[in-house]
Amino acid sequence: MEQPEALSPTTNATASIDQRIPILHAVTSDDIILRSDFTDRVRRVKHAGGPRVAVHLRAARFSARYLFDLACQIAEVQTETGAWLIINDRADVALTSGARGLQLTSRSMAPADARRSAPHLAIGASVHSTDDAARAVSGGARWIVAGHVFETESHAGEKGRGTEFIGQLASEHAIPVIAIGGVRPEHVAGLRAAGAHGVAVIRGVWYASDAGAAVIDYLSAHGAPGGQ
């Protein structure tokens, strides 16, 4: 199986790395993965976004074998389109499926440990505070997904950290900051102005009637071209 191109950890490569990190991250859930049309939607998302989009395979209830089989299917679309497949939390699946990246959370191994175990993978980290971000960056994360920025259904009643949080992280760290949490296309310009490299969404893509069109909406709001 062809391995994805490694991203150099050296600081003088920051500019080129920043350009290669996708600007739209479409994050899944167990319920989304179980939909009968999930793989078809993945294909539409990846073709619409090309290398500017990443599909995050995030699941809590499935076995490693199930996720591995699913990831291998999605990795084939990655090769066709240049779009990224990123596995959340499960380093074993990321290592063996042909995924391009690994997204770490507070429950995962540290970024530094992941880099030693999987030097060819691009590694990001999910953060919820400035301290989280500092630890992730010092451990070698190549990007951070930060939130939640706006109120979401999964955090109902909890005030979002706001655009200012993204701006603070972007000013403190020379790696891409990806904003997550209730982000709609109309929020993208403001987040980008604050310093966000891109955005991560769940409902905005996977619950849209046309997932491919939703991708184009987000990319257009960012000012980036789509895929194929």
Question: Residue spans of the language-model regions?
Answer:
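Glycine-rich beta-strand-to-loop/alpha-helix junction loops that act as flexible
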Residues: A179-V183, V201-R203
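Residue-level signal for pocket-adjacent positions within structured domains
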Residues: E153, A200-V201
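C-terminal binding/interaction regions
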Residues: A194
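A short acidic, helix-capping loop that chelates divalent metal ions and anchors anionic groups
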Residues: A94, F150-H155
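Conserved N-terminal beta1-alpha1 strand-loop-helix module at the mouth
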Residues: M1-L104, S108-P111, R116-R142, E158-R161, ...
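Strongly charged, low-complexity linkers/loops
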Residues: G167-Q168, I180
